[in-house]
């Protein structure tokens, strides 16, 4: 046995880095194992920016977790002196009776979240590049914006190390097994003992927890960065994040302001992607080439929402979503083993929560329960 720990965290990405941070801050001995580099482009967290919002159309039960998440991101910014969150506001647009727009109104009403209703004259005055369907509702949430995911993960990892955690990258977990009251974890570099395990392996969790993998599907998602003819109109100081249904297909797309390379990571341009599930795939064999057809389709979306602004394609990336059957998270303790904790199935809307999910996972590892309202995310829905 190479070393023993109170907790070993398998997967140090979005959720795992936050779990290591919270566990180590509580004085527990922690080992975080990551098969790739700490920040990498193979999973779900890469890509410069992630929207964070409170008028949560997916379900109002998420809003208390979001409020806590905002608090924790602010704490992490203060601890590190690093910018992690930029407030730009968020524009929602879609049919009045769509899940998107009904959900925004419901969460805002239940949880008293400030939102504004825009008409088209107001939209064109405040954000002139937009051209949205005249029959669609438009809602603006001022207290929304975006996180920088790579910086967030690096901040969690560095603060976890300061609190005593050991974080090991490029170390692949080959398997784990019960050993007495705890566990034995085998990697390509060693064998470790743990009293408790936290599994946060994202799209790779199926190989570590087969009973959960049966409830999950991994999808291939494409992301695009476009050049615009008037980039100043799209700067973070003048332009919001957005979620919008298209007129032609009714699919939901999302995007960000024009982010400058060097200021916001290595990429630049107007980032746009589709929020709907992509093609089902495998994390290890996903096609990471973006086809000409996919590029043409996204250009058409760009020209529908921002007519006359397309000035070329700058970058493309492929990332992974891991969907649960109902597209809500799975966060729980194994019903067969109180020392096995897992988080999975974040379904393309999880990153904004990783600060609070890390806190919940630390609660579950330390006490077997959390005071935060996560019962609706229990694995009992499926298992």
Mark where each language-model region is.
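Dinucleotide-binding Rossmann-like beta1-alpha1 core, especially the glycine-rich loop
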Residues: 49-126, 135, 253
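Flavin (FAD/FMN) cofactor-binding core of flavoprotein oxidoreductases
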Residues: 121-125, 146, 280, 292-355, ...
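Short beta-strand to alpha-helix junction loop
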Residues: 64, 92-100, 140-159, 287-294
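N-terminal Rossmann-fold NAD(P) dinucleotide-binding loop
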Residues: 16-17
């Amino acid at each position: 046995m190479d070393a023993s720990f109170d907790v070993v965290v398998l997967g140090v990405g979005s959720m795992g880095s936050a779990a290591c941070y919270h566990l180590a801050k509580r004085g527990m001995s922690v080992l975080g194992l990551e098969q790739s580099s700490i920040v990498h482009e193979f999973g779900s967290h890469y890509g410069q920016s992630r929207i964070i919002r409170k008028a949560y159309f997916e379900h109002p039960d998420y809003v208390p977790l979001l409020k806590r998440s905002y608090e924790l991101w602010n704490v992490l910014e203060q601890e590190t002196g690093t910018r992690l969150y930029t407030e730009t506001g968020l524009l929602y647009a879609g049919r009045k009776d769509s899940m998107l727009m009904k959900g925004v109104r419901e969460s805002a009403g239940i949880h008293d979240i400030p939102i504004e209703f825009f008409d088209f004259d107001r939209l064109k005055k405040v954000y002139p590049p937009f051209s949205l369907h005249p029959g669609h509702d438009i809602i603006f949430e001022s207290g929304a914006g975006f996180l920088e995911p790579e910086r967030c993960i690096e901040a969690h990892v560095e603060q976890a190390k300061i609190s005593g955690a050991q974080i090991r990258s490029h170390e692949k977990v080959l398997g784990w097994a019960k050993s007495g009251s705890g566990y034995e974890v085998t990697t390509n570099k060693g064998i470790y003992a743990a009293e408790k395990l936290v599994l946060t392996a994202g799209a790779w969790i199926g190989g570590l927890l087969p009973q959960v993998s049966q409830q999950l599907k991994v999808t291939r998602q494409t992301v695009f960065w476009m050049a615009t003819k008037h980039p100043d109109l799209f700067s973070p100081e003048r332009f919001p994040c957005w979620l919008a249904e298209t007129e032609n297909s009714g699919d939901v797309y999302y995007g960000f302001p024009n982010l400058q390379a060097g200021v916001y990571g290595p990429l630049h341009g107007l980032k746009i992607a589709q929020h709907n599930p992509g093609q089902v795939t495998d994390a290890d064999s996903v096609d990471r080439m973006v086809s000409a057809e996919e590029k043409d389709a996204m250009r058409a979306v760009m020209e529908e929402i921002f007519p006359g602004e397309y000035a070329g394609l700058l970058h493309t990336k492929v990332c992974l979503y891991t969907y649960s059957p109902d597209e809500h998270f799975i966060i729980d303790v194994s019903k067969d083993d109180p020392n096995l904790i897992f988080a999975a199935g974040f379904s393309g809307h999880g990153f904004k929560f990783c600060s609070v999910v890390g806190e919940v996972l630390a609660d579950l590892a330390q006490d077997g329960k959390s005071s935060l309202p996560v019962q609706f995310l229990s694995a009992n829905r499926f298992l």
